[in-house]
């Protein structure tokens, strides 16, 4: 009787060992079915960290990972996104291509603010650039407890950034001499805005560079500026909804898209 119990126990242990060993093996159907590429959430926030904050796919597959547009730092082998070293405030398309050539895509937003590429006509009263939060103009930017232009880099350089809401007063910036005493056509000024948002980031320090342009009239805007805006439009809008996916479905060859820095183009009249 004792021997029978011993044999039964050995059989049970063997079955249990086989079951445990099978889980997660390369031959598991769960690892060979359609790949569900996901990072756990569609919006990834910076987190307080002693080093770089990195987010990996919930499930890894062999193959090559890539991100579009330019600005996201992604490991091509593991798919891990270095949020700390990426341009935030934008929507990115992540693509995985398996060794067999199967393609899987998903989109993620790296939380933060940006500004739209836009002509601001001062004589028409269009003089305030509003920040866009989490890649969608309709998302409400949480202001309570948030701070913008930490360190006073932008305001100290003549760019009037409201510290409580991140808005840029362009007319006031001109009066403060952001382009000098008298701006000239094609004057440019790159500013950096450091900020902390009271959201899922836990007020982690974030930053954004914005490129300001000055022109007396629309007729003075040179062709290269129009080309920049045209390229960004044709390569996909990196803000509203699923437009990146829609752009990807177009029958064209994608080139490297550079959505940063946003172009704030100030025109006098």
Where are these regions (language model features)?
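C-terminal motif of bacterial Sec signal peptides marking the signal peptidase cleavage site
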Residues: 16-19
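Low-complexity "stalk/linker" and mucin-like segments enriched in Ser/Thr/Pro/Ala/Gly
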Residues: 64-82, 146-180
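Intrinsically disordered, glycine/charged-rich N-terminal periplasmic/extracytoplasmic linker segments
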Residues: 74-129
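Disulfide-rich extracellular repeat modules and their boundaries
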Residues: 24, 69, 85-87
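Solvent-exposed, low-complexity, repeat-rich "mucin-like" stalks and linkers
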Residues: 21-66, 109-161, 203, 210-269
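A short beta-strand micro-motif common to beta-rich folds, especially ectodomain repeats
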Residues: 87-102, 106, 177-199, 208-210
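Bacterial N-terminal signal peptides that target proteins for export
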Residues: 1-8
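Alpha-helical transmembrane segments
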Residues: 11-14
């Amino acid at each position: 009787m004792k021997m029978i119990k011993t044999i039964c126990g050995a059989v049970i242990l063997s079955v249990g060992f086989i079951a445990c060993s099978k889980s997660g093996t390369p031959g598991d159907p769960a690892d060979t079915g359609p790949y569900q590429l996901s990072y756990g959430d569609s919006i990834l926030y910076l987190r307080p960290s002693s080093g770089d904050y990195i987010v990996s796919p919930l499930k890894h597959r062999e193959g090559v990972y890539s991100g579009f547009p330019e600005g996201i730092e992604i490991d091509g082998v593991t798919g891990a996104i270095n949020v700390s070293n990426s341009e935030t405030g934008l929507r990115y398309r992540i693509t995985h291509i398996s060794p067999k050539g199967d393609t899987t895509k998903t989109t993620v937003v790296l939380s933060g603010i940006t500004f739209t590429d836009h002509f601001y006509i001062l004589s028409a009263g269009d003089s305030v650039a509003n920040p866009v939060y989490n890649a969608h103009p309709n998302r409400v930017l949480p202001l309570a407890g948030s701070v913008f232009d930490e360190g006073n880099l932008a305001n100290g350089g003549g760019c009037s950034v409201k510290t409580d809401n991140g808005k840029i007063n362009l007319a006031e910036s001109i009066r403060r001499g952001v382009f000098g005493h008298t701006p000239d056509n094609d004057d440019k000024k790159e500013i950096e805005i450091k900020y902390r948002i009271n959201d899922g980031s836990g007020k982690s320090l974030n930053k954004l560079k914005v490129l300001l342009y000055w022109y007396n009239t629309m007729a003075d805007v040179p062709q290269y500026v129009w080309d920049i805006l045209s390229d960004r439009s044709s390569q996909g809008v990196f803000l509203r909804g699923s437009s990146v996916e829609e752009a990807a479905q177009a029958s064209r060859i994608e080139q490297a898209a550079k959505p940063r820095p946003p172009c704030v183009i100030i025109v006098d009249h």
